[in-house]
A protein has these predicted regions:
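Residues within the alpha-helical elements of helix-turn-helix
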Residues: 46, 57, 90
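Charged, low-complexity intrinsically disordered regulatory/assembly segments
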Residues: 140-178
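Charged, helix-prone or intrinsically disordered regulatory segments positioned adjacent to compact structured domains
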Residues: 11-34, 38, 42, 78, ...
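Recognition helix of helix-turn-helix/homeodomain-like DNA-binding domains
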Residues: 59-79, 100-104
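Short alpha-helical "recognition helix" segments of helix-turn-helix
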Residues: 53-58, 87
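Short, cationic motifs built from Arg/Lys/His that form the positively charged side of catalytic pockets
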Residues: 41-44, 51
Length: 178
């Protein structure tokens, strides 16, 4: 099955105080799996960037300059750590959100959960732990989810928060304290 990502921007005109107001309605891209390549593609589309845009910013030239990025997005090629950092700067995203997860530290699991919600938006997770890092993450995440649900923030603002979120103790090694 082809992994298709799609997004739409719709404009909705309405009257407000006697004036015609145009509201932008954003429908998010669809995430079909949680592979590193699909996550990179999701953010690229969210940012309204083409493979050409990113290839240019990475300094890739030649007739087939998009090939490298296509291979990243399909998972056929792994980036070096420095290339991943360059890519995250271009995409304006925390590099931990688009890295390959090894699940050797708490932060990998927490970042994975942020992506899991993109596939299953109504998911609710309670790990029932006493770990301070995990509890802080869930407090902050649930606060932002509530703001989105109450329409205090829109999806774009919520997703911006997610892709730039930094787990407070990123370097913690995963252990079985609980």
């Amino acid at each position: 099955m082809s992994h298709i990502l799609a997004f739409f921007i719709l404009f909705c005109d309405r009257e407000k105080g006697g004036e015609r107001v145009r509201n932008r309605i954003y429908l998010r891209p669809e995430l079909y799996d949680l592979s590193q390549g699909t996550r990179i593609k999701f953010v690229r589309i969210f940012r309204h960037l083409t493979q050409d845009n990113i290839s240019d910013d990475l300094g890739i030239t030649g007739e087939n300059k998009r090939r490298t990025l296509t291979r990243y997005e399909k998972g056929d090629r792994n980036q070096s750590k420095s290339r991943l950092q360059e890519l995250s700067k271009i995409l304006l995203v925390n590099d931990n959100l688009i890295k390959q997860y090894e699940f050797k530290c708490v932060s990998d699991i927490l970042y994975f959960l942020l992506w899991l919600e993109e596939m299953f938006p109504k998911i609710r997770i309670d790990l029932g732990t006493n770990d301070e890092t995990i509890n802080l993450f869930f407090d902050e995440w649930n606060n932002m989810r509530d703001k989105k649900q109450k329409m205090i923030i829109n999806y774009e603002e919520y997703f911006e928060w997610k892709i730039n979120y930094k787990v407070k103790e990123d370097s913690n090694e995963w252990n079985n304290k609980n």
